[in-house]
Amino acid sequence: MFKDVDIKFVNKEITPFGGLSLFFKMLEKCGYDKVLQECGLPEQGSNRGYKPWQLVMGLFAGVWCGACKFGHLDLVRYDRVLSKMVGWDVGAGHRAYQRYLNKFTQATNQKVFGHLYKWFFDNLVFDNYTLDFDSTVMVREGDQEGAAKGYNPRRPGRNSHHPLIAFVSDIRMIANYWLRPGNTSASTNYLSFLDDTLENLNGKKVGLVRMDSGFFSGGDTRLSGIQEVEIYHCL
């Protein structure tokens, strides 16, 4: 009934995440490590600290392995094969990621992610984008930074965030993302968000902008602001 299975011990280190080598090769082919070194990542205060690009790559590896909390990033540290795949002697612990991410400010985020967005779209051989804008509600439990009470159909009265998202549907790629308090509406400061998004696209032609009626709750003045931008159609 049962088949015989060959069981033996080996001295070789193994990992269930060997497929990630393809992702790392892709990033290497794109020159992503050089881009990280040029995008203005915060510097470490100690010469014993992990290099910024190593922490970013470790964060990528952790997310690709299924990490959804900082504590899960220790998986990358203790998987020696995974560390060797990216050329590390040893990976960082999860507290190293927490300490490093605390160095980011709003200005730093704008500088770093603006550079990364421009690099991505510069290397994308595609033009005449369809740009979609949308907002959503993210329910927050406990006392989270920036969370506030506002429109929340799933959990009325609970704190939430109300992020604003721009994405290019043609290539299924996020073009911009702002995390906002829950007491904001869809149209709150969205013209600045549009300007920031077009700057991320770095000269690419936008043939169509799509957004729902919530973005025009401020009246015709907001619509006229949209029309001043070089966009061919707006729905």
Describe each region flagged by the PLM.
Residues 1-200:
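Dynamic "connector" segments at or just before major functional cores
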